[in-house]
């Protein structure tokens, strides 16, 4: 009798995706982050669902409903902090996942890569709207500043901003619609993840060498299920250390003050995972130029396959490309730091230099270095 997991219509899909899936035998721990992102998404949906049971999307009661969750709901404080810090874990895994794709040349799997970029934008939109919901000072002013950026669009900008606000300022209508979108988007993300995996399983995974691995495949279970489980334990350890020892480490103290349209906080800044893009936005004096640079800072990932000039897919045997990759990583850390600093000397000029370097590295320097390495292969 044939095994039920290979015959049952539903279990057959699960089997071909997670059990009998042929996987390269040499994929390293950098390949763990896909499954960790899946775990983060599950954690966020579950904790978010419980938070939504007690939260009220109304300007008069939103802030107090979050306080009520933390003080009066059984284990409400831990659910709230797992959700808030879970978002940080989500983005940490996302950035490493994208970085892994760049380093090992996974962007050559263009369908998977492009769906991944759409996923990145969707997750960023979800996180932004989620940050508005507690209706603290930084929630309100963050929503005001970021939505206002759309007014830079010629001709239709102002109308578009008022349409998103549902009025002439960020108010009850804005909060209600942001809650609705924040609730529905994770399910759209889940659907996109399935498409992401569908395209990945069409081609099979890349591996650290960047070579074809058809001649040397192993079943996903038990090898990579156990490996992913170990990665998950490390993720949960890090998350719970953050939640139980310093839950407000990555948050902003201003968000413990209820939203007040009459008082502007001294430094309006988003959560840490948006700071690099925020620094690029601020480094350009022109509003429309800043918005375009902000969008391009992520959208630039889509043209990576076109910028590939190397004969080797992975950076493993390309030391100069490795140096450029880690320079880019350091540049992103610099941009993240600058995004959290006030707009004054010397932070402005550092931000501008780091922004120019960011685009230069991806568009000019890295493809040029790859060409030089190609010529070095002939020597």
UniProtKB/Swiss-Prot annotation:
Membrane topology: Multi-pass membrane protein
Protein family: Belongs to the cytochrome b family.
PANTHER family in UniProt: CYTOCHROME B
Cofactor: binding comment: Binds 2 heme b groups non-covalently.
Subunit architecture: The cytochrome bc1 complex contains 11 subunits: 3 respiratory subunits (MT-CYB, CYC1 and UQCRFS1), 2 core proteins (UQCRC1 and UQCRC2) and 6 low-molecular weight proteins (UQCRH/QCR6, UQCRB/QCR7, UQCRQ/QCR8, UQCR10/QCR9, UQCR11/QCR10 and a cleavage product of UQCRFS1). This cytochrome bc1 complex then forms a dimer.
High-level lineage: Eukaryota, Metazoa, Chordata, Craniata, Vertebrata
Gene Ontology MF terms in the entry: metal ion binding; ubiquinol-cytochrome-c reductase activity
Cofactor(s), by name: heme b
Residues given in the record as a ubiquinone binding sites: 201
UniProt-listed Pfam families: Cytochrom_B_C (PF00032), Cytochrome_B (PF00033)
Residues the record lists as binding heme b b562: 83, 182
Designated name of the protein: Cytochrome b
More details: Heme 1 (or BL or b562) is low-potential and absorbs at about 562 nm, and heme 2 (or BH or b566) is high-potential and absorbs at about 566 nm.
Localisation per UniProt entry: Mitochondrion inner membrane
Residues annotated to bind heme b b566: 97, 196
Transmembrane annotation, as ranges: 33-53, 77-98, 113-133, 178-198, 226-246, 288-308, 320-340, 347-367
Keywords, alphabetical: Electron transport, Heme, Iron, Membrane, Metal-binding, Mitochondrion, Mitochondrion inner membrane, Respiratory chain, Transmembrane, Transmembrane helix, Transport, Ubiquinone
Any single Gene Ontology cellular-component annotation: respiratory chain complex III
Originating species: Mirza zaza
PROSITE patterns named in the record: CYTB_CTER, CYTB_NTER
Any GO BP: mitochondrial electron transport, ubiquinol to cytochrome c
Domain of life: Eukaryota
Keyword Repeat belongs to the record: no
General function of this protein: Component of the ubiquinol-cytochrome c reductase complex (complex III or cytochrome b-c1 complex) that is part of the mitochondrial respiratory chain. The b-c1 complex mediates electron transfer from ubiquinol to cytochrome c. Contributes to the generation of a proton gradient across the mitochondrial membrane that is then used for ATP synthesis.
